[in-house]
Amino acid sequence: MVGYDAKADARSNSKLEVAVAGSVSGFVTRALISPLDVIKIRFQLQLERVCPSDPNAKYHGILQAAKQILQEEGPRAFWKGHVPAQILSIGYGAVQFLAFEELTELLYQANLYQTHQFSAHFVCGGLSAGTATLTVHPVDVLRTRLAAQGEPKIYSNLREAIRTMYRTEGPFVFYKGLTPTVIAIFPYAGLQFSCYRSLKRAYDWIMPPDGKQTGNLKNLLCGCGSGVISKTLTYPLDLFKKRLQVRGFEHARSAFGQVRSYRGLLDLAQQVLQHEGTRGFFKGLSPSLMKAALSTGFMFFWYELFCNLFHCIRREDR
C-alpha cells in the first residue's frame, strides 16, 4: 500500500526497502516510456503549431514525429539522454516514496491523517516530490538538453555535456527551469497520490474484491487514471519548465524550426500566449498524457509489487 497504514504494521516495509522499491520502480518505468518522453520534449520545444496544416512545423503528430526521428536520427534517438534520465528516475523514485511514507506516518501520529486522507496524500505527495526535485533537478536539465539536441550533436555524451554547460553557462545552468518545476511538481504529484488513493477506493466500490487477487491490475489502472488527471491539470507549467531548461541552448534548436529567447517565466508565458495562442500552452499534450498514464501507472504498479515482494521474502525468512 502507498502511504502509512497503521492496520498493516506487520506488512510495513523498512526505509531501505521503500527506497529500493522506489528506485526500481523509477528505473523500469523510465526504460519503458523513454520514446514517448523524447517525442513529448520535441513537441514542447517546437514553436510552430503541432499540426499538419502548418507547413513550417517539423513535427505535427506522434506517429509522424516517431517516423521522422527514426529516419533522421536512428532508433537510438528515442533513448537520447537515457543515462541521465535513469539517474534522475532512480534517485527521484527513492527520495519521493521514502519521503511520502515518512510524511504520511508523521501526519498519522499527529492525528491529521484519518479524517483528511485526500488532503493528506495531496500535501505529502507534493512535499515529497518537491524534495525529490530539489535533489535531482540538475540531472533533469542534463536529460532535457541531451534529448532536445538533433544532429549533429552538440554534446556527444553526459560528461561532455556537464563540462561544456558548466564552462559556457556557469553552475546555475543546472538549475534552469527550477521555479516552474517546483511550482508544477507540487500540485502534479499531490494529485497523483491523492487521486490514486481515491481511484483505488472507487475501484473497490465498483468491483468488490470478493477474495480475488486483482491488486496488480487495480494498481496499474488507478495509477494510469491518476496520471492523466494530474498531468492535464498542470501541463502548462511542464511546458514552461522545458522551454526554460534549454535557454542559452538555442543554437542547437535551429534545425527544428523557429527559435525564441525568454527572459524568465512571466516573459515566456506572455510570448507563448502572444505568438502561439492558448493552444501553445498545451503543445505535446497527447504524448504527455500517454506518457503520464503509462509512467504513473507503472510507477505505482512496480512500487507496490516490489514492496509486496520484500514483505513475502521477509515472511519466508522468519
From Swiss-Prot:
GO cellular component: mitochondrial inner membrane; mitochondrion
InterPro entries membership: Mit_carrier, Mitochondrial_sb/sol_carrier, Mt_carrier_dom_sf
Transmembrane residue ranges: 19-39, 87-107, 122-142, 173-193, 220-240, 293-313
Broad class of where this protein is predominantly found: mitochondrion
Solcar repeats: 13-106, 116-202, 214-309
Keywords in alphabetical order: Antiport, Membrane, Mitochondrion, Repeat, Transmembrane, Transmembrane helix, Transport
One GO BP: thiamine pyrophosphate transmembrane transport
Entry keyword annotation includes Coiled coil: no
UniProt membrane topology term: Multi-pass membrane protein
Pfam families recorded: Mito_carr
Catalysed reaction, written as an equation: thiamine phosphate(out) + thiamine diphosphate(in) = thiamine phosphate(in) + thiamine diphosphate(out)
Molecular function in Gene Ontology: antiporter activity; thiamine pyrophosphate transmembrane transporter activity; thiamine transmembrane transporter activity
Subcellular location per the Swiss-Prot or TrEMBL entry: Mitochondrion membrane
Biological function: Mitochondrial transporter mediating uptake of thiamine diphosphate into mitochondria. It is not clear if the antiporter activity is affected by the membrane potential or by the proton electrochemical gradient.
Family affiliation: Belongs to the mitochondrial carrier (TC 2.A.29) family.
Protein name: Mitochondrial thiamine pyrophosphate carrier
Provenance organism: Rattus norvegicus (Rat)
Lineage: Eukaryota, Metazoa, Chordata, Craniata, Vertebrata
